[in-house]
């Protein structure tokens, strides 16, 4: 295996072992059509006889609304988007389990003015309708188990924040409890409280011992529900930071008994690396099982608004929901969608280095192309770190394809900045893998009918800028 431009690449294989989780989709409802990413079988051949190949990496699905304004997306559309983005949730949630949903409800006010945030689609906190849709899906899969919604707001009390943002039984049926971390982790500074679990982490990078809420730590499934936003502390905040910073018990790690803010538990200076090491450690002590990102609005220069004016001007109007079982993969795609190099994000680097997760070659994005969604999110203090992406085009691509029975033979040449290749036949996924500058891929496709078929080759650089070519064979 060779390393080119920060990407792992390998020569094309005669018998690919990777496969898809599902075909790129166009959405469940006409109300949220998603741009086609692959050609349809316009010749009318029997494309349904072709089977998807297998993909053993991580899949991140993006559902994109076609509404011009995020504020116009309805509750019904939001549920359809969540169902599309979390279509593989059934592989994680089973009946009889204890499931914890952890939305980001950081606070309900603008720091500088004290004014209240919008209750819906504000970009800072997770819209209650997103969490409601997740709760509904979980209950369908898990009617007999326990489902809790849990949060520890930075500026509390969390109970008031939940009530303001409609996180109550009146708005969300089916939850067994709405748990506020400062209420459900024992008394102030009681590290031996029965509601708390002490976790030893011998390989911890910052500390060797961490404390968790017992229900969270012992849950069968933890689903992180962050918003899509940038923050000077970690550049991009996503599914991992949402639990690593949002779930440490406020009564243990908070500033004071009446202040659950966890700013004192760890340095938030990205330059000294403490925050990244804390995020890494806390996540490794209790990884999440699924991530669903509320990107309906998106927000730059977070984690909260800087002023009354920027409460509105820093909204990004993204109109997306993202989901996946691999939090490192989801956060990597979040960084690329918001215009930041994932290799400049400290906690993601630590996770890649220590777990081998998050390599683009092993991530498949369904639903919408990253480079077509990308917007340039700013952060408050760029001097603290992070590399913002510049506008770029996909790698160069020349390709030819031929057929011998059920076997396709594809020759291609691409630029040295190419990182990965995907191949579709009649719109059905067949291959994903690393890329070499001058390669050949042979695919055996049982059921490939007689007649003309469309083969699409897509190559990406490590920022998921793409170039595609369609060939009739």
Q: Where are the regions a protein language model picked out?
A:
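N-terminal export leaders
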Residues: 1-3
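N-terminal and secondary-structure boundary signal
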Residues: 7-13, 18-412, 416-420, 425-433, ...
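Surface-exposed, short loops/turns at beta-strand junctions within beta-sandwich domains
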Residues: 444-452
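Edge beta-strands of extracellular beta-sandwich domains
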Residues: 466-473
